[in-house]
């Protein structure tokens, strides 16, 4: 009952999120629960924390990917980090991505594409706007493209 009150306070903007720092697996179990065990406000607070964690991860991985791109012209580490993140998501969140998401990431890694030289140093061919494509998918994608655009716009390489 206390947790429900805290979640209600959070939903009304007068308290901290009681689920802050909880694992993605636990958050998904609450946010997507339809058994009636959790209140709407608890489910909302859990979803909000998962969203906040996802956005923090996206900001970090985009910054790392930008550094990789600036230094090497490649995005292999970025794609590998995205694939690792995807594989670590709860199954209910993975299900919200396209069926071929993991294989597409693996393919992009195998391309070993050098964006500075504009050529694949591995096998296969290139895809346009791969970062935007990736970040427009998934359960928390709404702001993904906006984050990618602001991250690349605010870097020296983008000017």
Where are these regions (language model features)?
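Type III/flagellar secretion export determinants
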Residues: 1-159
């Amino acid at each position: 009952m206390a947790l429900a009150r805290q979640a209600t306070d959070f939903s009304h903007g007068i308290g901290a999120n009681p689920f802050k720092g909880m694992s993605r697996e636990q958050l998904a179990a609450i946010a997507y629960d339809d058994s009636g065990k959790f209140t709407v406000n608890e489910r909302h607070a859990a979803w909000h924390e998962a969203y906040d964690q996802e956005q923090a991860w996206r900001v970090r991985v985009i910054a790392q990917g930008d550094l990789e791109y600036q230094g090497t012209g490649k995005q292999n580490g970025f794609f590998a980090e995205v694939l690792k993140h995807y594989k670590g998501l709860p199954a209910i969140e993975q299900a919200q991505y396209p069926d071929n998401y993991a294989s597409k990431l693996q393919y992009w890694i195998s391309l070993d594409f050098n964006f500075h030289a504009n050529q694949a140093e591995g096998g296969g061919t290139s895809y346009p706007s791969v970062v935007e494509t990736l970040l427009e998918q998934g359960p928390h994608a709404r702001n993904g493209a906006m984050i990618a655009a602001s991250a690349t716009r605010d870097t020296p390489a983008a000017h």
